[in-house]
Design a protein with these regions (language model features):
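Short beta-strand element of Class I
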Residues: 1-4
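Conserved SAM/SAH-binding beta-strand->alpha-helix loop
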Residues: 7
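Short alpha-helix immediately C-terminal to the canonical SAM-binding loop
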Residues: 10-13, 95
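Conserved class I S-adenosyl-L-methionine
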Residues: 57-62, 86-105
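Class I S-adenosyl-L-methionine
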Residues: 94, 98-147
Length: 147
């Protein structure tokens, strides 16, 4: 597992959590998605998880969204044949934007949920962030995108 995080403080918390849980199959990279091609060979990733990435709600910050077509084109070569990008977010507008971006970039969408915790979807690994917002009654949006 490769965890990519641009915020050093968040990355340190993730490293500490992995140590606390005794996880030894995780590598950590402090940086942004633009750096991934330097570290990841083509056709080597089965799944990319975009869990609660920043929605950058201002239109002027759209280029920073991890589901912006610019980033989707970075991820494409890394995915194995049949590989998927799985996204979870609590932000409806970001989710709608993501659906549009994935579609424009040739991805096929599946397992779309507008309220993950009420959907009966099995196999969800709940993040701390997800637990927090779900417990406050916010729906969690989820999708899988494949080429």
């Amino acid at each position: 597992i490769l965890c990519v995080e641009r915020n050093r403080n968040v990355l340190i918390m993730a490293i500490d959590k992995a140590r606390e849980l005794g996880l030894d199959n995780i590598m950590f990279l402090c940086g942004t998605a633009e750096y991934l091609p330097s570290y990841i060979p083509n056709s080597s990733i089965e799944e990319i998880y975009l869990n609660f990435s920043c929605p950058f709600p201002k239109k002027s910050h759209e280029a920073h969204r991890l589901t912006n077509p610019r980033f989707l084109e970075i991820y494409k070569p890394m995915l194995k044949n049949g590989g998927a990008i799985c996204q979870k977010t609590d932000n409806m507008h970001f989710f709608e934007y993501s659906i549009e971006s994935f579609s424009k970039c040739g991805f096929k969408l599946s397992n779309i949920s507008l309220d993950l915790h009420k959907s009966g979807f099995e196999g969800n690994i709940e993040t701390e962030y997800e637990q927090k917002f779900s417990s406050q009654g916010f729906p969690i949006y989820r999708l899988e995108a494949r080429l």
